[in-house]
């Protein structure tokens, strides 16, 4: 249910006591380190499913007048340096909103927010426009926005003053388009491999990709796959998203 995420990251006092009593110190350590000691979790409910922009707007009382990150869980990115770390480093240089993007192929543009960039230079690109899910023949580029954003608090102004669309939804893409009238927004082509875990096939690919690199069971799992006739398997160190 809705409390699953809260329960997962909550302190499990009874479980910790049980693991300690049984001397299962490795498991106890793993449970205790789910959340770093300097991190506090705050949860905000979206009372109605009124679009991604509305969900972001629900966080305004918590975020306030600070830059913040948006992470969409469907997009799992296998990267040696976590993509948000890459983007935070860039934010430290430009001090403006940043959208993670990747080339999605012309036929896939109708599944993404697509950006128009002002330069043809290397990433990061200054964004000149953004449109939600255009048909391939109308797409300004093939750079699609994926589920990692760093946004300045100015975005809340545009979310609050946006005219709701179909079904009363408030779209983040529309607010970003309006934000372009106030300040620069950058598109960042990240380093890493993205899996769209809203897709059944990509979900399975992600499980396989992470399993063969798992520090505990990776070697055994690769052996199992080899026994099934799979010969092209990775053996890289674990990556992070």
Where do the model's predicted regions map?
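N-terminal FAD cofactor-binding segment of flavoenzymes
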Residues: 1-23
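Short active-site-adjacent helix-start/loop capping segments
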Residues: 2-7, 51-52, 79, 196
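Conserved beta-loop-beta/alpha segment of the NTase-like Rossmann-fold superfamily
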Residues: 14-18, 25-117, 153, 159-162
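Low-complexity, flexible helical/coil segments
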Residues: 27-37, 78-82, 103-110, 137-138, ...
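Catalytic-core segments of class I nucleotidyltransferases/pyrophosphorylases
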Residues: 69, 88-92, 119-223
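Generic C-terminus detector
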Residues: 211-241
């Amino acid at each position: 249910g809705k409390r699953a995420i809260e329960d997962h990251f909550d302190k499990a006092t009874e479980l910790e006591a049980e693991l300690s009593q049984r001397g299962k110190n490795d498991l106890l350590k793993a449970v205790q380190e789910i959340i770093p000691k300097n991190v506090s979790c705050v949860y905000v409910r979206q009372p109605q499913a009124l679009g991604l922009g509305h969900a972001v707007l629900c966080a305004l009382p918590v975020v306030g007048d600070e830059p913040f990150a948006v992470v969409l869980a469907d997009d799992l990115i296998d990267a040696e340096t976590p993509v948000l770390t890459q983007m935070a480093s860039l934010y430290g240089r430009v001090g403006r909103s940043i959208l993670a993007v990747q080339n999605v192929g012309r036929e896939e543009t109708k599944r993404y927010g697509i950006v128009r960039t002002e330069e043809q230079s290397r990433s990061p690109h200054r964004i000149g426009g953004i449109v939600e899910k255009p048909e391939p023949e109308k797409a300004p580029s093939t750079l699609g926005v994926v589920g990692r954003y760093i946004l300045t608090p100015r975005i809340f102004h545009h979310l609050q003053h946006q005219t709701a669309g179909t079904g009363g939804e408030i779209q983040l893409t529309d607010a970003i388009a309006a934000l372009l009238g106030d300040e620069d927004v950058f598109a960042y082509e990240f380093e890493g491999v993205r899996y769209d875990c809203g897709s059944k096939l990509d979900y399975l690919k992600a499980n396989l990709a992470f399993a063969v690199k798992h520090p505990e069971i990776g070697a055994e799992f690769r052996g199992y796959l080899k026994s099934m006739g799979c010969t092209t398997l990775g053996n890289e160190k674990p990556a992070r998203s």
